[in-house]
């Protein structure tokens, strides 16, 4: 177990410390909030806790075009999807209490395959926690740091909204796949120059993600399927914006 923990931690540090491209496969399983207690109990019984970051609150600021092209890619079921986001975590990873560690991420998805590039960006903590999404620094981060990732992006991207959720991480003992259970998914701040605030958005949905592994090779997933959890495509950003726009 010690060898496994050390090896896994090494990979996570490489992903977290700078620019890195991660080609991988990802499958999602979706359920309702009232199934959360069963799912988390089953994961704790059958899986290993993530040895590096077992739990966090994840905040993701999504960039989109004035025509919400990224949102429409997701809701339209496009086979090829691109998303750009600025992500941060609680507890924070920065040793400096005045700063927050964020990651500018560009993620391309083709079917179930995905490639994610990201770079670490340190920002002022107080500013990030309180700034309106029309603040020019959000665009400056994108203009300054995205080119170093060597990725093509749609023109006219601007901050759209912050999706926030609780993430609990596990390792499948059979395949060493990374397993994430996301719950309490909702939309926080929005850019009111792009979207109208029509009320709070809280999805009554849980999402189980299987990363770097084929679901057919994971025997314990059948128990979740029997409980009503279903494999399907799901975008937290897409679902939150659809709920905001009353299109869900």
Name what the model sees in each region.
Residues 1-248:
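Phosphate-end processing signature that detects enzymes handling 5′-triphosphorylated RNA
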